[in-house]
Curated annotation (Swiss-Prot):
Record's function text: Catalyzes the decarboxylation of 3-octaprenyl-4-hydroxy benzoate to 2-octaprenylphenol, an intermediate step in ubiquinone biosynthesis.
Alphabetical keyword list: Cell membrane, Decarboxylase, Flavoprotein, FMN, Lyase, Manganese, Membrane, Metal-binding, Ubiquinone biosynthesis
GO CC annotations, alphabetized: cytosol; plasma membrane
Gene: ubiD
Single GO BP term: ubiquinone biosynthetic process
Family: Belongs to the UbiD family.
Protein name: 3-octaprenyl-4-hydroxybenzoate carboxy-lyase
HAMAP family, per database record: UbiD (MF_01636)
Molecular function terms, GO-annotated: 3-octaprenyl-4-hydroxybenzoate carboxy-lyase activity; metal ion binding
Active-site annotation: D290
Source species taxonomy: Bacteria, Pseudomonadati, Pseudomonadota, Gammaproteobacteria, Enterobacterales
Amino acid sequence: MDAMKYHDLRDFLTLLEQQGELKRITLPVDPHLEITEIADRTLRAGGPALLFENPKGYAMPVLCNLFGTPKRVAMGMGQDDVSALREVGKLLAFLKEPEPPKGFRDLFDKLPQFKQVLNMPTKRLRGAPCQQKIASGDDVDLTRLPVMTCWPDDAAPLITWGLTVTRGPHKERQNLGIYRQQLIGKNKLIMRWLSHRGGALDFQEWLAARPGERFPVSVALGADPATILGAVTPVPDTLSEYAFAGLLRGTKTEVVKCLSNDLEVPASAEIILEGYIEPGEMAPEGPYGDHTGYYNEVDNFPVFTVTHITQREDAIYHSTYTGRPPDEPAVLGVALNEVFVPILQKQFPEIVDFYLPPEGCSYRLAVVTMKKQYAGHAKRVMMGVWSFLRQFMYTKFVIVCDDDVNARDWNDVIWAITTRMDPARDTVLVENTPIDYLDFASPVSGLGSKMGLDATNKWPGETQREWGRPIVKDPEVTARIDAIWDELAIFK
């Protein structure tokens, strides 16, 4: 089995174990706070995925830290290392704006991309592993799942890696999104989705088209990594997450129709929650510690009523925690950063690199380096970053530098900011823009400002002064000193 060929989560865990990337924990550990503490220490040390085989009080093992290193994210996307994710980004850029071949040679060059597209359709099964065991009606009991409580002041146990499947009333394509869900009863969860996310948009369209009718929802836990990662990757609106997962995996995504609704879920998922949202049924959600490192405020969200739980034999519960970076979302951000670069470069070829520092909570600050070509060019690029991909709608700070700056080296970036910027001239402030609901620093929930920093060398028209020339060493002198460096024995 190689990184390109795994069928489901269990195959992937076997692959990880073969490579020393999975640790089985047999000691009893409590899902209440203790698993978070162990997973956090392991992630910060760059350690393996963790399978807790004996969570206290539960018969089901807990998988944590699955995507705790960029390497494992790359493996989940069918690649051997993080650098190869640039190829995934190039494929997405091609699918976002496909160009017809310009001739036979161009057709030959594009054949690998066209071949991958053949794996896009889903494969529908009549029966599936995820429906080997079925609970319905009074037998539904979410408290039997080892749902983690991650932080001391969290309101209740929280489902974190649930892949929520919805479909709007006028859409053929389903939406897959990852939204956290607070456990509030044997068959009740709070579905925390923000208003602009796909699931929430499907729900709003349903309310308008079918007022008063229950909205079908299904949630997959323990799907294969390609399907999970497909839900957090900027796939084109014309491409389903299942289709993209098939591209990553190299095989068609297998799905099965739910028992209680027409939604299709990953056939090999460990656990499926089926149910509905009753229009008007809301509940206060939170507080929860989140990826910012703070507890968020309480707010009302729809209640998800679970009517069926289906699962595999010997099911595994997949979970994570979110907290101040580094955490699993931050690691995902580092890896997916490589996917974003080719997509941005296709739209803005002048971009050399793009970096989302993990300490910036994965997406709140971006550094862009570019080949500047005219006055005002940096401002065009920063506006493009905010508007081109919806993933950057919440990016509060965009720093634009020249291509002689390493976007991933704060020493370089800070040098550019402090030597190439005038605060009044080179700072762009945009007010009343969409902001993450969890960003309590914004004056209004969901609405705040953005700042762009033009840390590029200034061109005529941007300054009237003679611009500084960077110091460059004499290469001949450098070569002469290289030749005698060991002889000098300065550090011996």
